[in-house]
From Swiss-Prot:
Could be a nuclease involved in processing of the 5'-end of pre-16S rRNA. GO terms for molecular function: nuclease activity. InterPro entries: RNaseH-like_sf (IPR012337), YqgF (IPR005227), YqgF/RNaseH-like_dom (IPR006641), YqgF/RNaseH-like_dom_sf (IPR037027). Disulfide bonds: none annotated. Pfam families: RuvX. This is Putative pre-16S rRNA nuclease. Its EC number is 3.1.-.-. Belongs to the YqgF nuclease family. It comes from the Bacteria. GO terms for cellular component: cytosol. Gene3D superfamilies: YqgF/RNase H-like domain (3.30.420.140). Keywords: Cytoplasm, Hydrolase, Nuclease, Ribosome biogenesis. The keyword Cytoplasm applies.
């Protein structure tokens, strides 16, 4: 199941469980994870993209290791809410991960990378550390927005 509705995702995850958040780019995939109660999203690793089969294998390994019950993928939208050319890449990622058998939520990722960078600057991350971790921190912001909606605190 692939959806853009937090309500549909929440229904599919009636028993809760840990979620994985993905910020997909052309060169990297930022990964974040949340707790089983959908309270806190934390930045995880960054996957350097190679071939999709290898990327998927890394995601599958994280899903299995962490007992993930659902996937949240950042959906790049234009400022007016319309889909951008990059949106198709996120949708393709969702279709390719669908055979993992987990519900997938496409979540608006507007401004997450900029917000992650500002937060990292405020925390005095060096430029090199920001470049290394920006995608996983953006994934955490995407996932946090989604779990806030899933938990009912934002619709």
């Amino acid at each position: 199941m692939i959806t853009q509705s937090a309500l549909e995702m929440r229904d599919a995850l009636a028993e809760g469980g840990s979620l994985i958040g993905l910020d997909t780019g052309t060169k990297t995939i930022g990964v974040a994870l949340c707790d089983r109660e959908w309270r806190f999203a934390t930045a995880g690793t960054t996957i350097r993209r190679t071939k999709f089969a290898a990327d998927k294998a890394q995601i599958r390994a994280i899903v299995a290791e962490r007992g993930v019950k659902g996937i949240v993928i950042g959906l790049p939208l234009n400022m007016d809410g319309s889909e951008s050319p990059r949106s198709q890449g996120a949708r393709a990622m969702a279709r390719n991960l669908e055979d993992l058998g987990l519900p997938i939520l496409l979540w608006d990722e507007r401004w997450t990378t900029q917000a992650a960078e500002r937060a990292m600057i405020e925390q005095d991350f060096s430029r090199a550390k920001r470049a290394e971790r920006i995608d996983s921190h953006a994934a955490a912001l995407i996932l946090q927005g989604a779990i806030d909606a899933l938990a009912g605190s934002a619709f």
